[in-house]
């Protein structure tokens, strides 16, 4: 009898974390690697937030708090939704967890039974399918490639709904594409949902504050208040405030769902870190004046990366409305040979080639459920980003154009 549960047969380690691990190993060995794989901001946590955490430590705020988060933080979250999204939530409709990932994990553990289906537009954040599978649910993938602007249409959604559908996942702005749903697109999705009252929606809004070109962010519950009881919204402090390591995420939804998720959390991590909660209160209640400049900085990096990668004849690039990723179509390079004679057959091969030849770490598109693409994160310095993109361009220029998987001369 194996000590390892068969539950793990249905899931795999995070491929993005695997890329980060390999990159760190190469850097430690002295290799000049530029890492474009990590999904976290490159600026530091603002000083006022750090000072709030230091004060909490000095004040001895180091004990257990409420399992679902301390009331002061939940009040700050409630105020945030009213101030920024014009949505009213009660404190018992809010849960705080150890990062947005735990919020989502709790959600599916508390709501899915075997046979329940979850519609996941592809490409998707790598953890969605595995968390659904761990919760005995069944992921249902709907391909939304560059020809669809990486977004799920109302028509594609309706075709995917069955009597077993329990959840739809919407991530806007998206990881890995940066694609963002506008008012009309969300309104059309809401029209479909009104026809199917058994379908709930998880709206992952973690990149809410990183949008470009005057794009106006909307969350689904804001557009369809009549569906509020069926919409669970996930957010957190990781991206807007560069607090990925502080591990504070939050979710808002129906009282019954929050109560069930709190039970799950009480038997896993219990409360989130008390010190991080105090820091999160300051992030939400304190100055917000650095958010727009940081987003503008990301926009400049997006434009720089696009200006270089668009020169590569094998690539097709989508101009994202938010987040800090490019999801580049690269299938035209498949079938061609590298200088060493190896044929690039898929996105894994191409990512390996860029790591070996260009010394640039990217994440293959298949990790996000869509072959024929690769993801870069431009959350790095302008200088490093420019050098990385030039290296990618140069590496693609040295690939043979005469060989293909079909055996063409």
UniProtKB/Swiss-Prot annotation:
Primary enzyme class: transferase
Cofactor (UniProt): pyridoxal 5'-phosphate
GO molecular function ontology, one term from the record: glutamate-prephenate aminotransferase activity
GO CC, one annotated term: cytoplasm
Primary subcellular site in the record, as a coarse category: cytoplasm
PROSITE patterns on file: AA_TRANSFER_CLASS_1 (PS00105)
Stated role: Catalyzes the reversible conversion of aspartate and 2-oxoglutarate to glutamate and oxaloacetate. Can also transaminate prephenate in the presence of glutamate.
Protein name: Probable aspartate/prephenate aminotransferase
Upper classification of the organism: Bacteria, Pseudomonadati, Pseudomonadota, Alphaproteobacteria, Rickettsiales
């Amino acid at each position: 009898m194996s000590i390892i549960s068969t539950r793990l047969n249905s899931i795999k380690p995070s491929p993005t974390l695997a890329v980060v691990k390999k990159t760190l190993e190469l850097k430690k060995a002295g290799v000049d690697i530029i890492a474009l794989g990590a999904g976290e901001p490159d600026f530091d946590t603002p000083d006022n937030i750090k000072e709030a955490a230091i004060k909490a430590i000095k004040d001895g705020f180091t004990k257990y708090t409420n399992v679902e988060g301390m009331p002061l933080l939940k009040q700050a979250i409630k105020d945030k939704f009213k101030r920024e999204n014009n949505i009213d939530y009660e404190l018992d409709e809010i849960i705080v967890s150890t990062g947005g990932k735990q919020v989502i994990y709790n959600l599916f553990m508390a709501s899915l039974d075997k046979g329940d289906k979850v519609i996941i537009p592809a490409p998707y954040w790598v953890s969605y399918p595995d968390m659904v599978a761990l919760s005995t649910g069944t992921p249902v993938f709907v391909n939304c490639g560059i020809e669809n602007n990486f977004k799920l249409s109302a028509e594609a959604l309706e075709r995917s709904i069955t009597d077993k559908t329990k959840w739809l996942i919407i991530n806007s702005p998206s990881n890995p594409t940066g694609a963002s749903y506008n008012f009309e697109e969300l309104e059309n999705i809401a029209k479909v949902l009104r026809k199917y009252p058994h379908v709930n929606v998880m709206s992952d809004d973690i990149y809410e504050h990183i949008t470009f070109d005057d794009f106006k962010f909307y969350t689904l519950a804001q557009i369809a208040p009549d569906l509020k009881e069926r919409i669970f919204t996930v957010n957190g402090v990781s991206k807007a405030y560069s607090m990925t390591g502080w591990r504070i995420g939050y979710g808002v939804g129906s009282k019954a769902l929050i109560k069930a998720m709190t039970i799950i959390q009480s038997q896993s991590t219990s409360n989130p870190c008390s010190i991080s909660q105090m820091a999160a209160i300051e992030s939400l209640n304190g100055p917000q004046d650095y958010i727009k400049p940081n987003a503008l900085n990301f926009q400049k990096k997006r434009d720089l990366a696009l200006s270089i990668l668009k020169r590569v004849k094998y690539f097709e690039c989508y101009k994202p409305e938010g987040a800090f990723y490019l999801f580049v179509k690269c299938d035209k390079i498949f079938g061609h040979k590298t200088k060493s004679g190896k044929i690039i057959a898929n996105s894994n091969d191409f990512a390996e080639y860029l790591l070996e030849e260009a010394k640039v770490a990217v994440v293959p598109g298949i990790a996000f459920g869509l072959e024929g693409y690769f993801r870069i994160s431009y959350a790095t310095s302008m200088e490093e980003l420019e050098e990385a993109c030039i290296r990618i361009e140069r590496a693609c220029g040295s690939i043979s154009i005469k060989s293909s998987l079909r055996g063409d001369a």
